Amino acid sequence: MGFGDITNVTTGEARLSYVHLFKPYAHQPGAEEKFSCTILVPKSDTATKARIDAAIEAAKQKGISGKWNGVCPPIVPTPVHDGDGVRPSDGMPFGPECKGHWVFTANTSVDYPPEVVDQNGNPMINQSEMYSGVYALVNVEFFPYMFGGKKGIGCSLGPVKKVRDGEALGGSAPTAAQAFGVPQPAQQPAQGATPWGPGQPAVNPITGLPM
């Protein structure tokens, strides 16, 4: 398996959520930490969806001839879900950002950190440039698995290329400018103003009220 294989897909422009590209993350306590991100592919991008469908079918055939010992399950769990439907984990609707998208999560082990590049293809230096809500191209690999007697198709995370910024999704830490506004130039105290002293009440810098 690898680049050039039909199971390997590079998406069109997609939105990223739950971005953990530089530091591995465990979604549940005690679980294995992995690099990962959730990928939102617009349903209007039928070309990417067709490549994904073909990759999943090819991965099923690899499973039949390999790990699945010649038998394909009647229903094969796949990682791609309808963002207009409900989450398979809890039956609740996907978030509003998923509407009109195909949704899937790709991950890779701590031994294989994904290569992350900027719009020019250069290694991403500023890690804050990749956040939940950014738009990117993502290379993924679909593969068959058999774990604990369960068979299915998984999705491995490969290189990621930022395309453009987008509105940060919930769960992303706001910047200082977003939280407090653009900083204003420091103003000098008026001529003759009484300097701060221990006898004066402290003022809350956010509300302007005495503390």
Predicted features, each with a name:
Residues 1-5, 167-211:
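Acidic, gly/ser/pro-rich intrinsically disordered tails
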Residues 1-105:
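OB-fold ssDNA-binding interfaces and closely related basic DNA-contact patches used
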Residues 41-43, 142-144, 164:
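Beta-strand elements of well-folded, non-transmembrane domains
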Residues 87-88, 118, 126, 204:
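Acidic surface patches and DE-rich sequence motifs
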Residues 105-119:
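Short, basic/aromatic beta-hairpin or loop at an interaction surface
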Residues 115-136, 143-153:
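Exposed beta-sheet edge/beta-hairpin loop segments within beta-rich domains
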Residues 147-167:
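OB-fold/S1-family single-stranded nucleic acid-binding modules
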